[in-house]
A protein has these predicted regions:
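FIC/Doc superfamily catalytic core
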Residues: 1-298
Length: 298
């Protein structure tokens, strides 16, 4: 865990109001925040490097080289330091990608993003997995989402991207458009084409895609709620009829609304847990409000 409060330190550049610094700071905040989807933390060295880039003292390419050199000099590392290395390297790469304007809506672009994020980190960067996977999820009490069969990944990718490309947003309200984008993100994430790094690659791809619609992405969502983002994707793709659990995009829609429309939905991971008793919570809130109003009458 880094000693410095990276959120506070990077937020200061946004408060200064300089467009170039603001854009760079937002990219870094998103990049660092996204490491939380895999439980990773960045180092203080990464934060110092990010600040120098934001201040214009070094380029993003120089920032990446510094991070690589930093870890090349540290020959002996603990497991925690190896995880921090991954977080630092990938954060710098995300910041670079988010700073680039170029984008093409295609499966090839998504694979390219994954390769650029994880080259040298994962041996399979940018490659479609060659085996089926399961992942135990906290939000599902240890159960897993059913991901696409590895034999059909390419065809499924082509279908989902072709369907989205033909979809017309004309005539939709802004809320309807955001809900559709959330559903598309959910669908391609469920394919899970890569062995690792799917959620981070999905996030970067979707941010760049949504910017082509003129959206201004609120970095706070990924900065503070990356694990919520992953859990919301999980809940959007999980059914267990015996337990009365149905797939729902409502949690993901709230995240996307905060991300794109500057709404302020309360994003709590516990609300998504399949054992969360929503009715009980609402009953408790009703009791508390009733008691509160009665107290005002005396």
């Amino acid at each position: 865990m880094p000693d410095k409060n990276w959120q506070f330190e990077l937020e200061e550049y946004i408060k200064q109001g300089e467009p170039d610094k603001t854009e760079k700071s937002e990219a870094w905040q998103t990049a660092i925040g996204l490491q939380a989807v895999d439980g990773l933390n960045t180092s203080d060295y990464l934060l110092d490097t990010a600040k120098e880039h934001i201040e214009g003292k070094i380029t993003i390419d120089e920032a990446q080289k510094r991070i690589h050199s930093y870890y090349e000099q540290r020959c002996v590392r603990t497991e925690t330091e190896n995880e921090t290395k991954e977080a630092d390297i990938v954060s710098a790469r995300i910041a670079k990608l988010l700073g680039e304007k170029a984008f093409q809506f295609s499966p090839a672009e998504w694979l390219s993003i994954h390769r650029r994020l994880f080259e040298g980190v994962f041996s399979h960067a940018g490659q479609i997995r060659q085996y089926n996977i399961t992942k135990k999820e906290w939000v599902l009490n240890g159960d897993t989402v059913t991901y696409a069969d590895w034999n059909s990944i390419k065809e499924t990718l082509d279908y989902d991207f072709s369907t989205e490309k033909q979809f017309s947003y004309e005539g939709l309200s802004i809320d309807e458009a955001v809900k559709h984008l959330a559903k598309f993100a959910s669908d391609i994430w469920q394919i899970h084409p890569f062995s690792e790094g799917n959620t981070r690659a999905t996030a970067v791809f979707m941010i760049k895609y949504m910017k082509t619609f003129g959206f201004s992405v609120n970095n706070d969502a990924f900065e503070k709620n990356s694990w919520y983002f992953r859990n919301a994707l999980v809940r959007a793709n999980y059914n267990n009829l015996q337990k009365g659990v149905h797939s729902t995009t409502k949690f993901l829609e709230m995240f996307f609304s905060n991300l794109l429309l500057d709404t302020h939905y309360e994003l709590k991971n516990r609300y998504m847990h399949i054992d969360y008793a929503e009715d009980d919570s609402q009953s408790i809130n009703l009791i508390l409000w009733t008691a509160f109003w009665k107290s005002l009458q005396f």
